[in-house]
Amino acid sequence: MKKIKYGIIGAGTMAREHILNISLIDNAEVVALADPHKDSLNQCKEILKTEVSYFTNHLEMIKENNVDVYLISTPNFTHIQILKDVIKTKKHILVEKPLCTNTKDCLEIKNLTKGYPSVFWLSLIHISEPTRPTP
């Protein structure tokens, strides 16, 4: 079975959690990581056990075009611009909550993803876990 290739944008605490969780899935792997802060990239390098491409700009990762899923785990205020860039790829997208920091930006993303040909998923803690009731 072909492995699902993840490109993670943002190398902070949540990205490290995602790296650990993705490593538990047999048919998934992190193949690319982008963050403007080299210290954050280095912390992720310590836990990644596979060959990964590292970038200091998410646009470089997009240009390489080597991922199946973009996972956006950056500071909240950066989501809108990164989403605009990643949506153009038509690849699968998982973005950490909140989607954006204001209603205007959320509505813009809603409009940009109407009819989106791939999965667009907003990560909401516990809502996607079958063992927890939906609030």
Task: Describe the predicted segments one by one.
Residues 28, 52, 91, 118-120:
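Short, well-ordered coil/turn segments that N-cap beta-strands
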Residues 108-125:
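Rossmann-fold dehydrogenase core element
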Residues 125-135:
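Single conserved hydrophobic/aromatic residue that forms the stacking wall/gate
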